[in-house]
Amino acid sequence: MSSRTIMAFDFGTKSIGSAIGQEITGTASPLKAFKAQDGTPNWDDIEKQIKEWNPDLIVVGLPTDLHGKELDTITPRAKKFANRLHGRFGKQVELHDERLSTAEARADLFEFGGYKALSKGNIDCQSAVVILESWFENQWS
């Protein structure tokens, strides 16, 4: 197992959550939620985070329905976001199924912090954690 640093994003049209993790431990931590306008973040803010953490790989959650089918409205936009990350920063980017990540993130946050922990930014960042930890699990199976 390598010791790569991996960054993950949970794409949304109003907010984009992020997380960072280490492949060797398979663990991830929430970073920051970026405000977005119709899916477009402030790219300067994203750049600052990428420069600070210098990830070896970026994982972007791929929104699908419960059967794994792409969603007409949001899936293409998440793919476009992933392509822009690669184009702007030259980092390898992978898409990863994010089914049920928000539900799992809400449950995790509620368990440790109750209703007060359920802010939109916290949920989006925890969703990025769930996406990244799921990606780690897939690498090991």
UniProtKB/Swiss-Prot annotation:
SUPFAM superfamilies: Ribonuclease H-like. It is found in: Cytoplasm. Gene3D superfamilies: YqgF/RNase H-like domain. The keyword Hydrolase applies. One of its GO terms (cellular component) is cytosol. It comes from the Bacteria. One of its GO terms (molecular function) is nuclease activity. NCBIfam families: RNAse_H_YqgF. HAMAP family: Nuclease_YqgF. This is Putative pre-16S rRNA nuclease. The lineage of its organism: Bacteria, Pseudomonadati, Pseudomonadota, Gammaproteobacteria, Vibrionales.
